[in-house]
Amino acid sequence: MTKNGIDVSEWQGDIDWSRVRTDFAILRAGYGREVSQKDKKFERNYSGAKANNIPCGAYWYSYAVSEDEARKEASACIEIIKGKQFEYPIYFDVEEQKIFDLGRDKVSKIIEAFCHELEKAGYFAGLYMSAYPLTKYTTEHVKRRYAVWVANYDVSKPDYSGPYGIWQKSSSGIVDGIAGNVDVDVCYTDYPTVIKNLGDNGFPKHTAPAHTKKTMKVTVEYDDHTYSGLLEEQ
């Protein structure tokens, strides 16, 4: 299964979502530690995507250089996205060199701190990074623990050997309804099904008596890799 998508922020201006043709969209919710740092177009983009039946996820751009700062960023992110439904993960966007300068173990702890807060609040957490820092500055546990969205341009496939669900392949896409260039992505994972089955990201959790619960096999495809696991009905 392959889906083609885009990711957007206030830098794309006022998007005419009625003209956009895409399988999914990842929206910037905001950045930093304060609710006041919400992306100026987030509400408009969320409403526009939903009104036009475009499944969406969200991302939060990080400046955190400690676990405590990461938790504060998570709190701001959760405040902004609460009450909404997302078919795709909520991603922690790590790009700042000052974060990478802390080293792999510290970077990984910062990622875990943010994602743990998201999961506690009922969200399906993911990590966005470029291929090189993702390889160099995260532990194997982090690479496999969270949904990975990897950025790598001008290549036929990402220069990254770990599992990933979405590949951001270019920043120069042209999409009707959006003025100027936009990031374009390819998704290999059926996140909407997984997230809805889990009851994450604002979707209702399905409960049933213990004796009627079923266990289903979920297969997640990551480019050349396929990972399977068991998911119990909630």
Regions found by a protein language model. Name each.
Residues I78-F92, E96-K98, Y137-Y164:
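Structural recognition of alpha->loop->beta junctions
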Residues T207-Q234:
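Short, low-complexity, charged amphipathic interaction modules
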Residues E69-K72, P133-K143:
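Glycine-rich, charge-decorated loop segments at or immediately adjacent to ligand/cofactor-binding or catalytic sites
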Residues M1-C115, E119-F124:
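Substrate-binding cleft of extracellular glycoside hydrolase catalytic domains
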Residues L118-K136:
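Aromatic-lined carbohydrate-recognition surfaces of secreted/lumenal glycan-active proteins
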